[in-house]
Each structure stands twice: as structure tokens, then as C-alpha cells.
UniProtKB/Swiss-Prot annotation:
Gene: gltX
Subunit structure comment from the entry: Monomer.
Keywords for the protein's UniProt record, in alphabetical order: Aminoacyl-tRNA synthetase, ATP-binding, Cytoplasm, Ligase, Nucleotide-binding, Protein biosynthesis
Designated name of the protein: Glutamate--tRNA ligase
Motif ('KMSKS' region): 240-244
Positions contributing to ATP binding: K243
Family membership noted in the UniProt record: Belongs to the class-I aminoacyl-tRNA synthetase family. Glutamate--tRNA ligase type 1 subfamily.
Stored SUPFAM superfamilies: An anticodon-binding domain of class I aminoacyl-tRNA synthetases (SSF48163), Nucleotidylyl transferase (SSF52374)
Source domain of life: Bacteria
UniProt source species: Vibrio parahaemolyticus serotype O3:K6 (strain RIMD 2210633)
Subcellular locations according to the entry: Cytoplasm
InterPro entries in the record: aa-tRNA-synth_I_cd-bd, aa-tRNA-synth_I_codon-bd_sub2, aa-tRNA-synth_I_CS, aa_tRNA-synth_I_cd-bd_sf, Glu-tRNA-ligase_bac/mito, Glu/Gln-tRNA-synth, Glu/Gln-tRNA-synth_Ib_cat-dom, GluQ/Sye
Subcellular location, principal: cytoplasm
Pfam families according to UniProt: Anticodon_2, tRNA-synt_1c
Length: 474
């Protein structure tokens, strides 16, 4: 048997982190088993669906690198198939027409609540029977699935273990509305059957749907897939993760400067573990992932942990991979990196200091763009009269360098210190402010090596002019 999983979001909003984790688990299980992963868009809610949401889901999946083997399939393109299966159940007396209006059902529900009874649909209720008997052909009706009344539905959840629900606790589910459109729970079953889905990985909010769907599978004569229901993701305050906790859309994390590898690594650990290991390459995730190792308990989303992971991936990933995802942020900040050092070299030097790609894009501007002003605080502290001579000596030595390397620049700084008998800080910090415009950067010799000789000379001269003007105005 070829394992086949699916991710089946409804296009009523963005791809949120809970859905992304479900998609990741489903994708990993398929890859771990040498199987296939299907993407299906469950767009039967015609009032709430939008093409914008479909596009956002596809963009999020592509950004995370969760490539699908089949699809995307759209339920709205399969209504004829669903209605064919509804008619099959009607013909076999496994479904029936119900003419009870919404108003009548609301009235019955209110009576049940007043009598402290559990509100539920009962086909044998006198008022419902009367409505069905009084109906004429052509009157609006829904089609209900005739749920078994005896016995129980038992299934072995791959995460939660054995689950059993008595059939007498379940209503006769509506499977076709009065407007002729099929309902979610029915479409899902027909889709999973037609698409050969063997394993359904989804959120725990679907557990109540599962026994109802299992009865429909069996009524259709379809094989019942294996189910695995993931626990929810909580905010750091213990409440269900929502917009008030900050970003919940996958693409918001892109916008905030997270790498997809970091977000995938973080999401896989929200409920799954392999010993004490924290960092997983995609290959390791695929090889090690198991549904049996997924926790039944809810996991709390921790942004600090995600930032730590993101910093790890910025520091340790192939710089070309980081550059690929950095480009979006460079475009947002209107920073052209074609006029300057290779972006991969800059990433190697600056990346280890950054927790997000937004920070990285902000911190590399001085490699590619000249500036006309120094950061006020850094200039006030380091571009003073005492820095004039060290910078003048450094400028002369910089102009004399013929082989522009980090090693030669390091030696230049050491030579300035030796010649003037000063400590490293007396030249290092003024030089850093001069060539970067601010007081924070990696090692100044390495920074200068990438900025290039021409720019460094011009910036040191600008710093000396700043000091002269400052002294003149003192």
C-alpha cells in the first residue's frame, strides 16, 4: 500500500501556523513512508471563500517548501461527483429527505433546552414526522445521512490511541442542503475515497467529525483511512493561539524576517520530539518523523525560541539560501546590492549578529550605499579631536595598501597602534564609525575588506572633516 496523505484547508483566510504545522506533519509522514502528499482546497463554503485566501494558502505552502505531489484539487469543481454519491445513498435508503424547516428545528431545540434535554435532531420527533408527511414533491428539503442507531464507532487514533463514540450520540447529518450543495463532512469522505487517502492528519477540532465520517465511509463501501488528530497550539499565556498573541499567518513570519527552514524546524518541535535534539534539517525531519511520537498535549508558541532558531539558521545555512530569502526584504527596503561586495560574503560576516532577515537587511546598508551623516550618538562619542591623529595615520596607511585583504587591514590597525602607542580602542572605534556610519558592526578590518578601498578612503576623509568642523564650532 502506498501511503497518501493530504492537507485540506478552507480558503476563508490566511494559512495560519496551526494549519502550517498540520500540513508539515502530513507532508513529513508521506515523505517518511515514501508516499504522496495531496493538496485539496475545501471551498464548499461559498459565502466565506475568497480567491485571495486561496492564493495566500498556496503562497504559504510554497514558501515553506511543502511541495504537493497532487493537486490542488477544488471541491467546487466536484459537485457532480458528490451529488452522484448522495443519490447512491438515497437509492440504498442510507439517506433520506427531510422537509423540516430551520424555524421548526429551532423551535424543537428551544423546547429540548427548556426541558433540560440534550438538543439534537430526532427524525422520529412528532413535529418532524408531521412536516415530512405534509410535504409535497418539489418542496425544499435537505438530504440527511441515516446514521446507525446501534453500536459504536471505534477507531485507533495514531496520536491519541483508541477512541469510541456511541452511534446513538450522533445526529442524522445533513449531506445536501436545500440549495443542492453538498456539505463539508460528506465531501471530505468522497474526496478521501476518490483520491486514495490512506492517512488523515488534522487538528483535534475535527475529532467530533471523525465518527460521523467513518459511518459515511462504511455506508459508501469506501476504505476508512487511518486518523491522527494533533493537539492545538497555545499562546504563551495558555490561551488558544490567536491574532492577539501577535503574528499567526505564515506569511507574516516571512514579512518579519524568518527563514522557512527555521519556521519548519520550530513547528515540527511544537508537539513532536526526538530525544533532546532541537535542530533538524529537512532530511532529518523526514527520516525521523513518526506520528506515534507526536504529543497529545497542547504546545505553547514561544517567539523567543523561534528567534533563537532563526538566528541559528541565518548563521549556519548556506549563504546562498539566506540570500534567496533576504532578497524580498532588500526589495522592501529598496536596497540595491549589485553595487558592492557579494551579498553571500556580507551575510557570512554580518549574519551571526542577526535574529531576523529584517535586521540583516537593515544592518548591511552601509556596504552598498554611501551615507552623508554619522549616527549622532556614535559620532559624539568617537569622532572627537582625540581621534583626529589616529584617523589621519590610518588614512595614509589605507591609501598605501596595494593588496586589499582583511589580514593587511588588521596589520594596518596594529601598525597605527604601535606608531602612536595607543590601545586598539583609540583607533578601532573611530575607524568603525568612519567606515560604517555607526558604532555597531563586525570586526572593522573584515568590514573594510568588503566595503572596498575607494569607499573606505572617502569615508575616513568625511570623518576627518566632521571632526574638523566639530572643533571649529566648539
Amino acid at each position: 500500500m502506498t501511503v497518501k496523505t493530504r492537507f485540506a484547508p478552507s480558503p476563508t483566510g490566511y494559512l495560519h501556523v496551526g494549519g502550517a504545522r498540520t500540513a508539515l506533519y502530513s507532508w513529513l509522514y508521506a515523505k517518511n513512508q515514501g508516499g504522496e502528499f495531496v493538496l485539496r482546497i475545501e471551498d464548499t463554503d461559498l459565502e466565506r471563500n475568497s480567491q485571495e485566501a486561496v492564493d495566500a494558502i498556496l503562497e504559504g505552502m510554497e514558501w515553506l517548501g511543502l511541495e504537493w505531489d497532487e493537486g490542488p484539487y477544488y471541491q467546487t469543481q466536484r459537485f457532480d461527483r458528490y451529488n452522484e454519491m448522495v443519490d447512491k445513498l438515497l437509492a440504498e435508503d442510507k439517506a433520506y429527505k427531510c422537509y423540516a424547516s430551520k424555524e421548526l428545528l429551532d423551535e424543537i431545540r428551544a423546547e429540548q433546552e427548556a426541558n433540560k434535554e440534550m438538543p439534537r435532531y430526532d427524525a422520529n420527533h412528532p413535529k418532524i414526522k408531521a412536516a415530512n408527511e405534509a410535504a409535497k414533491d418539489g418542496d425544499p428539503c435537505v438530504i440527511r445521512f441515516r446514521n446507525p442507531k446501534e453500536g459504536s464507532v471505534v477507531f485507533e487514533d495514531q496520536i491519541r490511541g483508541r477512541i469510541e463514540i456511541r452511534n446513538d450520540q450522533m445526529d442524522d447529518l445533513i449531506i445536501r442542503r436545500t440549495d443542492g450543495s453538498p456539505t463539508y463532512n460528506f465531501c471530505v469522505v468522497v474526496d478521501d475515497w476518490d483520491m486514495g487517502i490512506t492517512h488523515v492528519v488534522r487538528g483535534e477540532d475535527h475529532i467530533n467529525n471523525t465518527p460521523r465520517q467513518i459511518n459515511i465511509y462504511e455506508a459508501l463501501g469506501a476504505p476508512v483511512p487511518t486518523f491522527a488528530h494533533c493537539a492545538m497550539i497555545l499562546g504563551d499565556d495558555g490561551a488558544k493561539l490567536s491574532k492577539r498573541h501577535g503574528a499567526v499567518s505564515v506569511m507574516q513570519y516571512r514579512d518579519m524576517g524568518y527563514l522557512p527552514a527555521a519556521l519548519n524546524n520550530y513547528l515540527v518541535r511544537l508537539g513532536w520530539s526526538h530525544g533532546d535534539q532541537e535542530i533538524f534539517s529537512q532530511e532529518e525531519m523526514i527520516n525521523l518523523f513518526s506520528l506515534n511520537a507526536v504529543s497529545k498535549s497542547a504546545s505553547a508558541f514561544n517567539t523567543d525560541k523561534l528567534q533563537w532558531l532563526n538566528n541559528h539558521y541565518i548563521k549556519n545555512s548556506d549563504p546562498a539560501y539566506v540570500a534567496e530569502h533576504l532578497q524580498w526584504h532588500l526589495d522592501q527596503q529598496k536596497l540595491d546590492v549589485t553595487n558592492g561586495p557579494a551579498i553571500t560574503d556580507v551575510i557570512k560576516l554580518v549574519g551571526e549578529r542577526c535574529h531576523t532577515l529584517v535586521e540583516l537587511a537593515e544592518q548591511i546598508r552601509y556596504f552598498y550605499e554611501d551615507f552623508s551623516e554619522f549616527e549622532a550618538g556614535a559620532a559624539k562619542k568617537h569622532l572627537r579631536g582625540v581621534a583626529k591623529e589616529p584617523l589621519e595615520v590610518a588614512l595614509a596607511k589605507v591609501e598605501a595598501i596595494t593588496e586589499w585583504t582583511t589580514e593587511n587591514l588588521h596589520q594596518m590597525i596594529a601598525d597605527v597602534c604601535a606608531e602612536l602607542e595607543i590601545g586598539m580602542g583609540k583607533i578601532g572605534m573611530p575607524l568603525r564609525v568612519a567606515v560604517t556610519g555607526g558604532g555597531q558592526s563586525p570586526s572593522v578590518d573584515a568590514v573594510m575588506a568588503l566595503i572596498g578601498k575607494e569607499r573606505c578612503v572617502a569615508r575616513i576623509k568625511m570623518a576627518l572633516e566632521f571632526i574638523a568642523e566639530r572643533e571649529a564650532n566648539a
